[in-house]
């Protein structure tokens, strides 16, 4: 579980970007490459502690491989009563 506010912000940005990329047609391999690049940039910038980056990677990887995060919502069929 993420507790640091800056780490949570990065998590929210990452997951929003991943869903947007999924909706554009990118798939798991592309999402993983995006995540790897994002984490490499965080490591290079030293904006987070290494243990926070590791936690962020674990949580985001778990998010990527949960298929329910990328399902399109299905509208409820309306029943007409006459």
Which functions belong to the PLM regions below?
Residues 43-45, 73:
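Extended rod-forming repeat segments used as scaffolds/tethers
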Residues 46-47, 52:
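Acidic, low-complexity, intrinsically disordered interaction modules
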Residues 18, 35-39, 53, 60:
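Generic L/I/V-rich hydrophobic alpha-helical segments across diverse proteins
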Residues 24-27, 48, 69-70:
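Intrinsically disordered or highly flexible coil/loop and linker segments, enriched in small
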Residues 39-43, 64-67:
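A structural signal for well-ordered alpha-helices, especially hydrophobic packing surfaces
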Residues 2-36:
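N-terminal acidic leader/helix
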Residues 29, 41, 50:
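Short, electropositive, low-hydrophobicity segments enriched in small/polar residues
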Residues 4, 54-82:
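Charged low-complexity stretches with an acidic bias
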């Amino acid at each position: 579980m993420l507790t640091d506010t800056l780490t949570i912000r990065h998590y929210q940005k990452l997951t929003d970007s991943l869903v947007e990329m999924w909706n554009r047609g990118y798939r798991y391999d592309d999402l993983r490459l995006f995540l790897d690049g994002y984490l490499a940039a965080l490591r290079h910038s030293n904006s987070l502690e290494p243990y926070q980056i590791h936690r962020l990677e674990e949580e985001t990887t778990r998010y990527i491989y949960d298929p329910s995060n990328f399902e399109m919502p299905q509208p409820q069929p309306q029943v007409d009563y006459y």
